Amino acid sequence: MRVRKRKGAQEHLENNPHYVILEPEAAKGRWCEVFGNDHPIHIEVGSGKGAFITGMALKNPEINYIGIDIQLSVLSYALDKVLASQAPNVRLLRVDGSSLTNYFDAGEIDMMYLNFSDPWPKSRHEKRRLTHRSFLDTYKQILPENGEIHFKTDNRGLFEYSLASFSQYGMTLKQVWLDLHASDYQGNVMTEYEARFAKKGQVIYRLEATF
């Protein structure tokens, strides 16, 4: 979903270099230095307005989190949440999900999250889906052996596509939820969109897969 352009968004990011890594190429291979510790690093590709990444950071202080989004205004709203939370273990990047190997070394990321990604329903846009094989190639390079992807969506078509994509890639589907909010799954942290969908009674799909 697109967000209306936010005035001053660029300046907002530039004025907060502690949380927003403005030159992420320079951090490649040295993210432990950026965070000041050697804790595991989890990333969310398509972090939206930051509810999930901030919530996870507060819930798990022993894990470092990086929220990634290419949309300037969206990332500025995520920064608002990070600043309000004062979570020391979260950083933000404005980069494209297809270029992650420019910013992370092999195996430097321990886990990644894909939450409510754009489904790109038209066949001609298949390669833009974040669970397309080309993206999986990228994710595999920055995750360790048996690295995990946790995926959530309200879009059944994208969920079915992703199940097939992960399986055809040779990944292992650890767990699958066909109605997350009706399940006994504990510890779910919702995104802004997820909270909105939940109020409408929409089904949320979730899976965990490993390389």
UniProtKB/Swiss-Prot annotation:
| Class of this enzyme | transferase
Active site positions: 118
Binding of substrate, residues: 122, 154, 191-194
- Please name the PROSITE patterns in this protein's record: SAM_MT_TRMB
**Where does this protein act, in terms of pathway?**
tRNA modification; N(7)-methylguanine-tRNA biosynthesis
Quote the record's binding site residues for S-adenosyl-L-methionine.
44, 69, 96, 118
Chain spans, region Interaction with RNA: 124-129
Q: Which reaction does it catalyse?
A: guanosine(46) in tRNA + S-adenosyl-L-methionine = N(7)-methylguanosine(46) in tRNA + S-adenosyl-L-homocysteine
Coiled-coil portions: none
UniProt GO cellular component terms? tRNA methyltransferase complex
Arranged from A to Z, the UniProt key words for this protein are: Methyltransferase, S-adenosyl-L-methionine, Transferase, tRNA processing
Alphabetized InterPro entries for the sequence: SAM-dependent_MTases_sf, tRNA_(Gua-N-7)_MeTrfase_Trmb, tRNA_methyltr_TrmB_bact
- EC number(s)? 2.1.1.33
Q: Which domain of life is it from?
A: Bacteria
- Recall the GO molecular function terms of this protein's record: tRNA (guanine(46)-N7)-methyltransferase activity
Provide the family line.
Belongs to the class I-like SAM-binding methyltransferase superfamily. TrmB family.
Q: What does this protein do?
A: Catalyzes the formation of N(7)-methylguanine at position 46 (m7G46) in tRNA.
What is the name attached to this protein's record? tRNA (guanine-N(7)-)-methyltransferase
Q: Which organism is it from?
A: Streptococcus equi subsp. zooepidemicus (strain H70)
